[in-house]
């Protein structure tokens, strides 16, 4: 019996070693300050699991997960202050700096400040951009000045697709409409900016994964992440 166990362990060693060495790039992480922590997400998830108690605990738990699962890079988006806080704690140079925006004027943003933040390397990915929650789409005119800047500096764009949290329209995102989260609604952007790299967050969500796949097969500059697909 013991001999069989030893042989089994020996046979599994190469597999276990390979798994432990797998390097992961997480394309979809959110940062918070205490002022916006818990403003959108419920205290417990669908399965009853409780989240972090506050923004500081969330940061520590996420960095522990980075280490545990060998996440070597992570695209982190949130308000600019929160991303800076995460950078200050990032001794392993894991964080790729993003910015979470529902509307083009969030945080008092304008194109002058946005371009300067890119020049200062405070924004390395434009996203998560989530027009859906603000009642717009990435193809709307209000987003075009930002997209032109991103194409100019080769800044990837991460755009929300698929729906949001159940009941969100009745609470924190009254302008959100499910139809606005269809990946097909960004096709005009893909045509207008052929050099602009974009990835579809949530891969079209639970409603439009086929639309995401079809777009990616047609437009070579389009990618996806696979975060929270259901």
Question: Model-predicted segments: where are they?
Answer:
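An N-terminally biased module of ancient metal coordination in phosphate/nucleic-acid-related enzymes
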Residues: 20-79
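Alpha-helical scaffolding within the catalytic cores
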Residues: 58-62, 79-87, 107-114, 182-187, ...
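Active-site gating/metal-coordination segments in enzymes
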Residues: 81-168, 177
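Hydrophobic h-region of N-terminal signal peptides that target proteins for export
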Residues: 10-18
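Catalytic metal-binding/acid-base residues of hydrolase active sites
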Residues: 28-32, 79-80, 130-132, 162, ...
């Amino acid at each position: 019996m013991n001999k069989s166990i030893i042989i089994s362990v020996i046979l599994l060693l190469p597999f276990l070693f390979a798994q432990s060495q797998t390097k992961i790039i997480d394309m979809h992480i959110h940062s918070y300050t205490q002022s916006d922590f818990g403003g959108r997400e419920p205290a417990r998830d669908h399965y009853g699991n409780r989240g972090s108690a506050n923004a500081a605990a969330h940061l520590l738990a996420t960095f522990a997960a980075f280490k545990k699962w060998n996440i070597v890079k992570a695209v982190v988006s949130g308000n600019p202050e929160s991303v800076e806080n995460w950078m200050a704690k990032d001794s392993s140079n894991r964080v790729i700096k993003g910015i979470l925006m529902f509307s083009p004027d969030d945080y008092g943003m304008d194109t002058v400040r946005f371009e300067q933040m890119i020049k200062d390397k405070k924004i390395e990915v434009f996203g998560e951009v989530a027009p859906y929650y603000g009642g717009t789409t990435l193809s709307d005119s209000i987003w075009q000045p930002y997209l032109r800047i991103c194409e100019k500096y080769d800044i990837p764009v991460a755009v929300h697709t698929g729906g949001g949290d159940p009941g969100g329209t009745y609470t924190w995102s009254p302008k959100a409409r499910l139809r606005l989260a269809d990946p097909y609604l960004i096709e005009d952007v893909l045509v207008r900016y052929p050099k602009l790299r974009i990835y579809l967050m949530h891969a079209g969500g639970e409603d439009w994964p086929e639309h995401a796949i079809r777009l990616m097969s047609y437009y070579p500059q389009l990618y996806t992440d696979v975060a929270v697909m259901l």
